[in-house]
A protein has these predicted regions:
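A glycine-centered loop/beta-turn motif at secondary-structure junctions
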Residues: 171-253, 257
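Juxtamembrane/start-of-transmembrane alpha-helix segments at the extracytoplasmic/lumenal side
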Residues: 252-268
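Aromatic-Pro/Gly-enriched surface loop or interdomain linker
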Residues: 2-73
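An acidic, glycine-rich "communication" segment
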Residues: 115-187
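Second-shell loop/turn segments in exported
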Residues: 37-42, 86-88, 214-215
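Soluble non-cytosolic domains of exported or imported proteins
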Residues: 42-46, 89-93, 219
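Membrane-embedded segments
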Residues: 64-146
Length: 268
């Protein structure tokens, strides 16, 4: 091989490596947050935009509530469902009283929250002692979720790898109907309860990860969420914006430079 040809080949290889490096640096600018964001206005792995979009296109009437005070016409309705994927958000006693009024009017309320114990204490009609533990958690990388169409594994993933997570479960067993479970280390734990209130019903769910983009795109999770919603079905869906509440946030995870591609499942 003559010297000029070697130089040409070497220059070509260098150019390819340079292009690859530039491509990597370009891709690195497209960063994704792997913390539990629970926002519905973006495409982060743990945002809620896919779920919100599917709920909006479900064929039901759909209305977004930006908080509970700006427009209170929802309080005069009946036969409807309010959905609040709270994540780590919390509410105060005044907001809780508005939600209870909504339910007792003849509506359903579904809240999925990591702050399960606090939420139950604010919303339940059950008589509860001050020192009674309503919810607790177990640490694990993976749990087995029970759905009407079978079981599936669920994990909190960072850079697409499972990480240890606090899985919240509902410990109180009086007054509530246990409607959903997950399994960990051979034991079943309740993660969905139902409680009749007035002419409506309260549903509290303790595994909000299933509503996030990263998991909701999977068929098993999509079907599970549909079945949860079916328990609280109404004529109109009121979607309570998670951004209207304080978000203390879950464990903070660094951003990944890897491109995260969300595969939106076909609507069924």
């Amino acid at each position: 091989m003559d010297r000029n040809r070697k130089i040409a080949i070497g220059a070509g290889v260098f150019a390819i490596l340079l292009l690859a490096l530039l491509f990597y640096l370009f891709q690195s600018n497209e960063r994704f947050a792997w913390s539990e964001t629970y926002k519905d206005d973006g495409n982060q792995p743990y945002d809620l935009s896919l779920f919100k979009g599917v709920l909006e296109e479900s064929g039901k009437n759909f209305e977004v509530l930006n908080g509970l005070f700006a427009d209170t016409s929802y309080l005069e309705s009946s036969g409807n469902t309010m959905v609040f994927i709270a994540g780590y958000a919390w509410m105060d006693s005044t907001e809780a009283q508005l939600l209870k009024r909504f339910v007792k009017k003849g509506n359903n309320l579904l809240i999925s929250t990591m702050e399960t114990g606090k939420t139950l204490r604010l919303l339940t009609d059950c008589e509860i002692d001050e020192d009674e533990t309503l919810a607790d958690s177990k640490e694990s990388e993976v749990i087995q979720m029970y759905g009407e169409e079978g079981t599936f594994t669920l994990s909190y993933e960072v850079y697409n790898e499972p990480r240890t997570h606090d899985w919240v479960y509902i410990e109180a067993q009086t007054c509530f109907e246990q409607s959903g479970f997950f399994e960990l280390d051979g034991q079943r734990y309740c993660n969905l309860i139902a409680e009749a209130q007035g002419d409506g019903a309260l549903f509290i769910h303790s595994t909000p990860l299933v509503f996030t983009n990263y998991h909701f795109r999977k068929d098993s999770v999509f079907n599970y969420v549909n079945n949860v919603l079916a328990k609280a079905e109404g004529e109109t869906y009121y979607y309570l914006e998670p951004g209207s509440y304080d978000q203390p946030g879950g464990p903070q995870i660094g951003e990944s430079p890897l491109k995260f591609i969300l595969a939106h499942p076909s609507l069924k």
